[in-house]
Structure formats: structure tokens, C-alpha cells
Amino acid sequence: MAKTIALIASLDTKKKETLYAASVIQKQGFSTYIIDISTKNLVDGADITPVEILKRYGIEWEDFDPLGKAASIDVMSKAAAFVLPQLYAEGKFDVVISIGGGQNAKMAAMAMKTLPFAVPKIVASSLACGSRTMEQYVGDKDIFVMHTVADISGLNSITKTVIQSVCSAAMGLAEYAKTFPSEEGKKVLGATELGVTSKGTENALHMIEESGLFENVVFHANGVGGRCMENLMREGRIDVALDMTLHEITCETIGGYCVGANDRLMTAVEHKIPMVVVPGALDMVDYFINEQGEGLPDDIDQRKKVYHNSSICHCKIYK
């Protein structure tokens, strides 16, 4: 049976480009499923329309249509995030992609983040470049991101090449991506580490590995890694946690580069997952140094510090 690739798009502004992408995929024997997240006008060509998406979310188009731009984008983003996992559970698609500008990419990525680990996801955007943050497109999920180089506005030799590349990647994932079970008879153990805690974590994992009872998975506690571990715990992919690096909590509390983990340690408690906690790196924060050499606190020279590289400085929170 042919695999199906879903395309999340705003057909009111990108219909021609979306249908071209669908034709590229269909010519290779794959099926397509177009998810229209338009917020302005209703057009044909979708497998599920904005009206149907909103209806599943509990909103009628008549109530949605008068909303302003910002409000309509916010509502449609939430509606798409609510509906996409339903569509996946219904078997509507195997891979999901989005090709467009900043607005479409942000909306599509928000929806993709609701899908489980290992469901292939690709966001291609003209804003996936430069100093833009990857948080809005990837966050703590396994989303592939591609810069489209040119704006996806019309079909030309550049945009068609980009669309072909994205579709080819999607077809490759549909054909060859696979998930692996844990080693037979072993529980999966998730552990956190950072450069300054890596020796301790690695020594602990070596001792655990010798027992032959666990498969170890290590997460870089960089503001996202801790969240990734906890997401996999929620999905039932991690059975035991060895949380040896907690400085994400410090950054979340007093500031620093590795922010973004404001609910750390909660998942194991909520899901009754065995967990050993060690306050590794709890007494430090990280600072990102930009190309102009800015980003460090004024009193940095009064504190113990280690430069991880030219861009990141590990700093003690006390003088």
C-alpha cells in the first residue's frame, strides 16, 4: 500500500505551489493528503478544509471569519495542533511536511509538535535561517528543518528545485524511516548530562550497563534535552530516569542560555516513573556570547567560569 505524505499549507496564498508539491509526490507513486490551514479565504483543493479543521476544534467558520489577522492565526494554529494527531491516529498520513513562509511554518510546526517521536516531520521555510530561533520550528521535537533560500511565492527554477528537494526527503522518509524497539529484555534508562557533569554521568552509566538490565539514552541538558527526555517518558519510551544535570532549572529560575525547561522533574512523578535525581550543575548557568562579544554579565570576572567554546561560557552562580 502506498505511503501517504500530508502537506500542511495555506491554500488561499500557496495553492499553486502546494498542488505542484503534491504532483511531485504523486508522480513517484505516493499518496498525498492536503491539510488547508488558510485563515483568509476558502478555496478548493484540500483533503481537509479550514472549515472542517475548525469544526473539529469546536469553532464555526462564521465565528472565525471576522477575527483579525493575529487572532485568526492563533486560533487556526491551536485548531491544527488539536486536529493533526487525530488525523495521524486515523491513518490519514505517514509523513507530514510544510513548505512556505514564516506564518505557515510557525503554524505547521506548532501542529507537528503534537505528533509522537519518530513520525517524520519536515518544515521548509524562508525564515529558517540567519539569527532566527529554532525554538518555534523544532522545540523539543524531531522536526527536520530546511531553508527554502527563496520565498515560496510562485513557481520558478529555484522554488521548484527546493520543493523537489523537500518532497524527495519526505518520500525517502516514507520509504525508509523506521523505529527500533529497545534491546530485548532491557528497560530504557534516560540520563541527563552536560560537559561539566559528563564524567559523572558516563561513569554511572558504565556501572549500570554492566548489569545488563538497561539500555541507556543520554540527553544533553541544554534547555531542550531535559524536555526531550521528559517527552519520551510521557510517550512511554523511557522506563527509568537518572537525572544528573539540573542546571536547566537554574537557568529557568535566574536566567541563562539553557532556559526552556520550566516543568523539569514533573513527568516522572506524574507518570510514576522511577527516578534518581542528582543536583549536577545546579550551581551554574550558561551565557551565550554573540558575534559582537556581548552576552556576559558585568561581574563575570568575579565569578568562577569555564569557556565551553567561543560562544558559550559556564559560570558559577555565586562569587
Question: What residue spans do the PLM features occupy?
Answer:
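Short Gly/Thr/Asp-enriched flexible loops that form oxyanion-binding sites at enzyme active sites
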Residues: 100-117, 201-204, 255-264
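A glycine- and small/hydrophobic-rich beta-loop-beta segment
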Residues: 247-319
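Gly/Ser/Thr-rich loops at beta-strand to alpha-helix junctions
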Residues: 10-16, 94-107, 128, 190-201, ...
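Cap/lid and interdomain-hinge subdomains that line or gate substrate/regulatory clefts
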Residues: 65-68, 131-196
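Glycine-rich phosphate/diphosphate-binding loop of Rossmann-like nucleotide-binding domains
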Residues: 14-24, 33, 39-51, 184-223, ...
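Short, acidic/small-residue loops that bind anionic groups at enzyme active sites
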Residues: 95, 107-137, 144-147, 217-221, ...
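N-terminal phosphate-binding or glycine-rich loops at protein starts, especially the Walker A/P-loop
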Residues: 2-41, 95, 101-123
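Phosphate/nucleotide-donor binding subsite
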Residues: 44-92
